[in-house]
Swiss-Prot record:
Source organism per UniProt: Paracidovorax citrulli (strain AAC00-1)
Protein name: Transcriptional repressor NrdR
Zinc finger feature spans (unnamed): 3-34
Positions of transmembrane segments: none
Record GO biological process: negative regulation of DNA-templated transcription
Length: 149
């Protein structure tokens, strides 16, 4: 692997560890030219289903969109990045287990809402109010009442 510091084409693996959950491998590498060390992560490459939008367009699955949705909903909420990553991984696992080539964006939205509801009720309400496109206060109030139960 090329060194990110000096671009030397060869580096040596000096340490390898499997993550606690076994999902990826962490490697410490050292450059033979500049002697600097850096870390790489290896995880299996998987093929997610394409996402079918409301208007019928088909786009590639994009993890960063999930991260963005969680970040907005959880802004200034007491939820760690580890918890967010775990929630996203659960969603991705469900998408892969569907075994389908396409998934509706609404299905992904429902999975996000389910995970947010477990993580933080306020974030769940924030996301749901935008996702479900509430048009009046009564819809909002009904959701809050549902969460309180």
């Amino acid at each position: 692997m090329k060194c990110p510091f000096c671009s030397h084409p060869e580096t040596q693996v000096v340490e390898t560890r499997v993550a606690e959950d076994g999902d990826f491998v962490r490697r410490r590498r050292q450059c033979g030219a500049c002697d600097k060390r850096f870390t790489t992560y290896e995880r299996p490459e998987v093929s997610f289903p394409n996402v079918v939008k409301k208007d019928g367009r088909r786009i590639e699955y994009d993890r960063s969109k999930l991260i963005g949705s969680f970040s907005i909903a959880l802004r200034k909420r007491p939820v760690s990045t580890t918890q967010i990553d775990s929630a996203i991984e659960r969603i991705e696992e469900k998408l892969l287990n569907l075994g389908q080539r396409e998934v509706l964006s609404s299905r992904i939205g429902e999975l996000v809402m389910r995970e947010l509801k477990k993580l933080d009720k306020v974030a769940y309400i924030r996301f749901a109010s935008v996702y479900r496109n509430f048009e009046d206060i009564d819809e909002f109030r009904a959701l809050v009442d549902e969460v309180r139960k």
